[in-house]
């Protein structure tokens, strides 16, 4: 079981970031999804067995848990919701209820145990870049082209 609420814009941004590495088609259905882990905050991970992205977003977590949702379906649903707080709740069978304003959706998730473990990057080799730094690098790249 899992329950949290989060601003739609923050959630949509995190989904967009993590979805960049999700496999479009895979023999492993979980790889077409995003791993959602609710603890003190919400962590969303995308992985295609070669590249992975993990991003964290501020959320009001009522009940901790984790599950996998199809990235395309989840992203489309959140994108179509009104700009308000999204309330996410999942039961023990991974049935997810999403509500935001007048919009309500029910979708079936997958168990987090179906999701492959992302490799751990050692601190000696990791890179941490603030989002603003990435925006500047993107601008510089466009300027140089």
Residues of each region from the PLM?
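Structural preference for solvent-exposed beta-strand-turn elements
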Residues: 1-145
């Amino acid at each position: 079981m899992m329950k949290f609420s989060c601003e739609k814009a923050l959630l949509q941004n995190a989904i967009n970031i993590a979805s960049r590495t999700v496999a479009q088609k895979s023999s492993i259905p979980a790889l077409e999804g995003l791993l959602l882990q609710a603890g003190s905050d919400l962590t969303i991970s995308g992985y295609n067995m070669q590249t992975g992205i993990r991003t964290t977003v501020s959320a009001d977590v009522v009940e901790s848990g984790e599950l996998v949702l199809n990235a395309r379906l989840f992203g489309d649903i959140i994108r179509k919701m009104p700009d308000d707080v999204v309330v996410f709740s999942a039961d023990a069978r991974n049935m997810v209820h999403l509500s935001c304003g007048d919009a309500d959706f029910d979708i079936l998730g997958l168990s987090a145990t179906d999701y492959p473990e992302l490799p751990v990057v050692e601190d000696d080799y990791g890179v941490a870049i603030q989002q603003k730094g990435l925006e500047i690098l993107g601008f510089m790249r466009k300027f140089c082209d």
